[in-house]
Amino acid sequence: TACVIEVNSETDFVAKNETFTSFVEAVNAAALASDLQGGKDGEDIEALLAVPFEGATVKDALVEKTATIGEKLSIRRFEKVAGDVAVSYIHGGGRIGVIVAANGASDDAAREALTNIAMQVAAMNPTYISRNDISAEELAKLQEITVDAALNDPASLPKPILNKLIDKAMNSSAWSDED
C-alpha cells in the first residue's frame, strides 16, 4: 500500500521548510495507517482531519503548524493504492507525487517497472489512464479543438493527416495509449 497527500502552503519558501516537509511526511504516514482510501471531496478531507495524530488529530496538528510556520496550510487531497507491490515517486521537490500499485509480482523487477511507470506518469501529467477513460463529451471536445486548429492552418490538411492529429491529441491525454 502507498499513499500520497497534497498539503498546500502559500509560498514555495514554506514548502521547502524542513518543519513543513516533516509534517507532510508524518500526515502521509497517518493517512497510510488509517482505513481511509483518499479523495479530494469534503468528506474525505474531513475524515483525514479527524485521524488521530501525535496525541491529537490531524486537524489540530494542521492548526498548530499553521501557527508555528506563520502561513496557512491546507490539505487539498490524498490517495491510497494497494497491491502486491506499491511504489511512490516524488518529483520537483515534492511538487509532483505519483503512486502506482500492481498485483501478481512483488520482486525487485516489478518494483523497478512500477517506479519507471510512476516516473513516466509524473513527466507526462496525463489526464486519463487510457482512451477508454475519456468521456464521450471530452472526446468530442478534443476532436473539435483539433479540427478547429487544423482548419485554421493555412496548409489546409488532408483528411488522413487530420485524423492522425485527432488520434495524437487523444493519445496525449491518456498515459497508456502513448506511443
Regions found by a protein language model. Name each.
Residues 1-179:
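N-terminal assembly/interaction segments in proteins that build large macromolecular machines
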